[in-house]
């Protein structure tokens, strides 16, 4: 066992040969490497599988022995400074290793088919393997310096993968946005690391925690404030990496990368890195109560914000991205409350559920591309979907399992972990608990909204009702594909938000009359306006994905069904079946938490029934609003008559419009950043440019112009006439003496006498000089 731990340092470097060999192959043998590009998926999967087996073995040893292994190499630079590098294998590292490798293998297996048509296939697998290497190095780091190095490598890989299709301007902009936003957090992380080293003299976790504890125990207020500041800076790095408020704005734009990358980034790697950092540094944060309160506050804000922003998204991947943001907020909330076990439990269950949802969405997008062509604006648009359950039944089943899990429906994975966080939130703060429980209802609503828009009803892409010609007939098409005759003037249309522009003030349920162009002056606005897209259609309907993609979905379904078994807290006296608690025992003792908590069935049912009822309410509302049966209710005008009786219809419309605008415009946070930060920086740049060109250059150019015009003016006085020189000489002498008499109070008559005598002498001298010139020349 000791032998295995000693060589565990090689874990991060096992996948590294793949990007190195791909790069060398493209440089030395480009034609052969490209011709046999599909071969490279095998070593990528094989090497990561080796890491997974080693990680599972280490985790088994952790469970059986509750053992923490750390090995450090010291590099002495001089007598006063040395760097220490090593690796740390503890329960947290073991959990993250299994999470990264299992999800990574399935993503690699899935990507082999998903990216087979792409010219950047080799580049994709090189990036992906290096991404896995960086993340494995991050979770096994034994000190803050190593964490920062691999932290930056993870950020670099995410930049490359988000902008994988860099020829698309929107993808290039998205990767730059992610990179710049994360630079804010990374700068804070670097300052926090340097600050802690300055006060403790060590980067190692154990030494750092011990020294900081001693400093705080001495009741030194200066040390406490400085440690609090450093902790805040460290937390800023986690906020950016895990897309927490207010540095979350990069997350939805990260969807411009390939879908397998979205699954990896939003499930087990990049966004999980911030949660991992807070969990790793939790002993430091625990001794600074203000930081713990800040962590929980940021977490609960992100929980609610992510859920509300997901309500009106048309893009299926953006909806899942905001869902990820909200679920990461739950984990951050749990860490801020001190619920270390609940946070890691939800990290595990959410990783597999969200990977299943993203890979399922990739299967959906893959099937839609055969109809609408390659265009993310069309293939990812849920407005053009619908009725896919008849065409992609396996994907539908897998997506439904992931949706139910994320909604918190038992016995699926996320139910157990989310319920534990909700229960702990009632003990921490009733206000936070109310917000967290309400968000659970929002989660169920928007996730079933995504499911119903995608799989129920009819395929909406086949209803192309406006071709841009005068003679084209206009239909008002309901969400589920049923053509409504043009004579209907005020149909009660479900969720008009799907076709609204950002500046429109249309309610959720009522259509407006609006101008479209010169061909159509005024018409009833259709629920879905689909322009005819000229493309080659290989299939008239979507088709199920290949078996290699479905295999990854099947394995993730199994994980979603059974992974929660490792953490179900039904421990009774005399039995201990909670594997997660046994694994986390060393960490729990480090945090001074009691691990002997037993949960009986009555308490569990009481707590779970409330959260499940909220989730079912959200599902019911989504089903009521989005289920195809609504079309028949609309035809009978049942909801129309009910809605028209409302006395507060105008107010209700305004509320719905506000909710839609808030969600679709990303809470106006991006706009605020654009106006305040981007606009402010541009304004400062323009001011600097004006000051440089007009003031600095103006002063220098002013001296030059003044000298030029003065020289041009004086050259006319140098005509060669002595009388002119004499006149100027006399004038300057008079001015000088006049100023001198003003400052020295010299009598004026003395000045006149001096001027008269000097003038006479000057005239005599000039006359003699002129006479001399006349006689000799």
Swiss-Prot record:
GO molecular function, one term: quinone binding
GO cellular component, one term: chloroplast thylakoid membrane
Regions crossing the membrane: 9-29, 40-60, 89-109, 125-145, 147-167, 185-205, 220-240, 259-279, 290-312, 328-348, 355-375, 397-417, 426-446, 550-570, 604-624, 731-751
Keywords of the record: Chloroplast, Membrane, NAD, NADP, Plastid, Plastoquinone, Quinone, Thylakoid, Translocase, Transmembrane, Transmembrane helix, Transport
Keyword ATP-binding: no
General function of this protein: NDH shuttles electrons from NAD(P)H:plastoquinone, via FMN and iron-sulfur (Fe-S) centers, to quinones in the photosynthetic chain and possibly in a chloroplast respiratory chain. The immediate electron acceptor for the enzyme in this species is believed to be plastoquinone. Couples the redox reaction to proton translocation, and thus conserves the redox energy in a proton gradient.
Protein name: NAD(P)H-quinone oxidoreductase subunit 5, chloroplastic
Source organism per UniProt: Oenothera elata subsp. hookeri (Hooker's evening primrose)
